[in-house]
Amino acid sequence: TEVKATNGSTVKLTIDRDLQNQLMQAVDQSVAANNAEWGSAVVVEIGTGRILALVDSKSPNPADLGSTSSANWGSRAVQAPVEPGSTGKVVTFSAGIDQKAVTPTTTFTVPYSITMPNGETVHDNDPHGTETMTVAGILAKSYNTGLIQVGDKVQDQVRYRYMKGFGLGEKTGVE
């Protein structure tokens, strides 16, 4: 059976062309500098959720799809499962400060590595000596070992509530 076509609606894109181009250059440079297989980035306007830029390295040219591997035809920015990395640290720090378990000036002794009770060793990205650091300093340097100590001050149920509050595990609407 045939279904008669109906007129569609007007679509207004929120992509900022200049920002899109700058972000694409930055991602391409980062991929090259880090010898990475690929890279993606998204810029979202806080408050509205509007997508201002969304880029994937090795994006296909729609006019010449044959020149790009089919592995790059989708958008990894919205489809590829990746670890959230250090972006997840914001949740733990926010919960700790908001719940008054720590303040930005609370200090911790922060070693390069920590062995967890289960035997797993967690270390920071770059080697460093043991440092006395504030919570603000730990966040600024993105130290995993400091994060663990801040996280120990926040109950698991509270951190879970904050994760849900930040929208983790929810669809973004871009899918």
PLM regions and their residue ranges:
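Extracytoplasmic/periplasmic proteins that interact with beta-lactams or build/remodel peptidoglycan
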Residues: T1-G39, P60-A63, P81
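Beta-lactam-recognizing serine transpeptidase/beta-lactamase-like catalytic domain environment
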Residues: I15, E45-S86, V91-E175
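Short beta-strand scaffold segments in enzyme catalytic cores
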Residues: A41-V43
